[in-house]
Amino acid sequence: WKAERMGLSNDPYTPAQARIEAEGVIAREQSNGELLLSARRNRLIVEERLHVPMPGKHRFRKKTSWTFGIDNQDRDGFFIGRNLQPIEVARDFTLSLQPQFMVQRAINGQNTTISELFGLKAELKGQIWGWDTTWEADITTFKPQDLADGSRYWGNLENDFELPWLGDITARLFGAHRYRAWNGSLGETDIYAALGGFIEQRKTFDLGKSSNSYLWRLGLGNYQAERFSSVSLVDSMRANFYGSINSSYSIWRGKEAPMTPQKAYRYSPVAIVPGLTFDTNVNTLLAAYGDGTHQNTLSFSGGPTLTLGTFSQPFLDYTRVSMSGGVTLKQGSSPFNFDQAVDLSTLGIGITQQIVGPLLLNAGFDINVDAGSEFYGDVINSNIELSWQRRSYDFGIYFNPYEGIGGIRFRLHDFDFNGTGVPFMPYTPTNWMEMANTDRPF
């Protein structure tokens, strides 16, 4: 369709906190569902004060075009990335590219060559033989001598099936080269090669006042990864079963602010409801290895989450505090570093606090509290973020000291007005092994 003048906003209220104003507009919907706008004049207006000129062509996607990040391990600190327009390489495949420039490497490096200052993130998504497939590459240098050690690759093929008695399950075939993993007190560890597959099922259900979800996963693969307590590598088969149940029980639920743009939706696209819940996780991991060894764990973690205020007043009207303690029982030992259970007693604390207006501070950490462990007192995860949260957009600066990664993000919320998006995600402590085993691609 065409229009001489157009206004577009993701804010259902007037005045809109963020809107796009364009002249001489031609709009085309792409095959992947994205909307491509071409205009003679295009600008983003924020809070009716800030006018930001925009390109004549704009593609509405969930991620912003520019990325500002910190990666102390692979990129030597601060870097800038640019998300290019996706390329349709075939009828069923789309290639997304993000060239990167290593700013801090350029500033600090005395003998750095041009090829070391650039990197690339690439993602190829598509469908083959009815399977959804995603392949990703993370290249942090183009220096020929360092290209092999400066690149990481991983991908999978995924499909849904229905099995008798089990219902719908997901099957996934995976592969990885130099995959970057984290394992609590052991820190970063590389999986140099992985090839295998698994089936899994995820479900949610309510039981009385509790909301529950479960995951089970059965997998088999061959891994070449760093050996536990050694600098050498180990190559071995690994068969494993993982099961997890999360529950949240509502103890007290308050009343949200009136559903108006001056109250409940003053700063947030969702109404904040005061309350107290008790959250628990029970999980087990059974793993057998090609050398005849095995490792079995049974973990329990739980704790309260208290929400005070409705985030509708200009000062200290939203506080969210979470606390979680975890205990793990362990039998046997893994030959690998990436799945070795070492943090057998943990404590996590997270807090989100409104400072003034839409300014929020979000911080949290998990530590090892096993008095008999050599890692007693070690931080096994941490996060801190300062965000400017509005009904239709948010801006955040975040850093994870444990992983040494961080960044700056600006995001317009989804046009269906149904969530806060990233990075406004209050930190909730969780059992480390439960988190690590569900987030990995294998």
Spans of model-derived segments:
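Structural signature for solvent-exposed beta-strand/loop edge elements and short helix-capping sites
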Residues: 1-167, 177-189, 341-345, 356-373, ...
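Residues that flank catalytic or metal-binding motifs in active/ligand-binding sites
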Residues: 21, 195, 382
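Short, solvent-exposed loop/turn segments that connect beta-strands within catalytic domains
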Residues: 31-35, 209, 314
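Acidic, Ser/Thr- and Pro/Gly-rich intrinsically disordered regions
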Residues: 115-117, 140-142, 150-152, 187, ...
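Short, aromatic- and cysteine-enriched interfacial helices/patches
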Residues: 129, 163-166, 207, 270, ...
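C-terminal, extended alpha-helical scaffolding domains
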Residues: 152-156, 176-198, 202, 217-246, ...
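N-terminal lobe of the biotin/lipoate ligase/transferase fold
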Residues: 169-171, 195
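Exposed, low-structure sequence patches enriched in small/polar residues
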Residues: 211-217, 221, 226-228, 234-442
